[in-house]
């Protein structure tokens, strides 16, 4: 009797230790955090995730919205095997599924942006047994025109530098071509001058020979 009790105690203690050492199952969410888009355009709210468990039919994705000026949280989109769009509210007929669970992508597409779409969008992914984890957030700003960011300035600088290099290369190539053409023209003129000089000398020689013969 005592032997069975001690064995159970050891197994229970071992189970507790293994549970403590086993990593907590949690879904990691990755978003752009901040997104700026022009009024009237469409925007892709990108949300990707990682999970210890393989992706299966139990996967669920929930998108919600918190208005910038406050107010209750609003339903945006739900995915479980199939996408479920909202039947009413501000996002009715304005949101579609743009993700791929096999590629760990839970993104959605929001159409015809309006200024009252400003706010925070949350992306929650559950992939049992991975059901815990931080909810991803995207702060959307709908503007009249997109402002230049550091990336835009960097792209503009790189593009300008590339254009300048191309112009320099073209100028160098044209200059080399012009020099070769000038050298060819000069060489041709030299050959013509030499030919004319030789012809003149030959004529003079013929005249002098003729005069000698007449004498």
Swiss-Prot record:
One of its GO terms (cellular component) is cytoskeleton. Residues 27-154 are extracellular. Mediates homophilic cell-cell adhesion. Disulfide bonds join 47-123. It comes from Homo sapiens. Glycans are attached at residues 39, 118. It is linked to Deafness, autosomal recessive, 111: A form of non-syndromic, sensorineural deafness characterized by early-onset, moderate to severe hearing loss with no vestibular involvement. Sensorineural deafness results from damage to the neural receptors of the inner ear, the nerve pathways to the brain, or the area of the brain that receives sound information. Residues 1-26 form the signal peptide. This is Myelin protein zero-like protein 2. Residues 27-141 form the Ig-like V-type domain. Keywords: Cell adhesion, Deafness, Disease variant, Disulfide bond, Glycoprotein, Immunoglobulin domain, Membrane, Non-syndromic deafness, Signal, Transmembrane, Transmembrane helix. The gene is MPZL2.
């Amino acid at each position: 009797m005592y032997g069975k009790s001690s064995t159970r105690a050891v197994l229970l203690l071992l189970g507790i230790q293994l549970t403590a050492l086993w990593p907590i199952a949690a879904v990691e969410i990755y978003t752009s955090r901040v997104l700026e888009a022009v009024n009237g355009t469409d925007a892709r709210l990108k949300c990707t995730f990682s999970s210890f468990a393989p992706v299966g039919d139990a996967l669920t994705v929930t998108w919600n919205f918190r208005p910038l000026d406050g107010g209750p949280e609003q339903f945006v989109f739900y995915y479980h095997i199939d996408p479920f769009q909202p039947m009413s509210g501000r996002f009715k007929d304005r949101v579609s599924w743009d993700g791929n669970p096999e590629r760990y992508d839970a993104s959605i597409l929001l159409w015809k942006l309006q200024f009252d779409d400003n706010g925070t969008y949350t992306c929650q992914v559950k992939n049992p047994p991975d059901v815990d984890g931080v909810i991803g957030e995207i702060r959307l700003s709908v503007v009249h025109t997109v402002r230049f960011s550091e990336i835009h300035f960097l792209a503009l600088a790189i593009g300008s530098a590339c254009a300048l290099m191309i112009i320099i290369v073209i100028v160098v190539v044209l200059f080399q071509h012009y020099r070769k053409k000038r050298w060819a023209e000069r060489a041709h003129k030299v050959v013509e001058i030499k030919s004319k000089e030789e012809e003149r000398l030959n004529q003079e020689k013929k005249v002098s020979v003729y005069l000698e013969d007449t004498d």
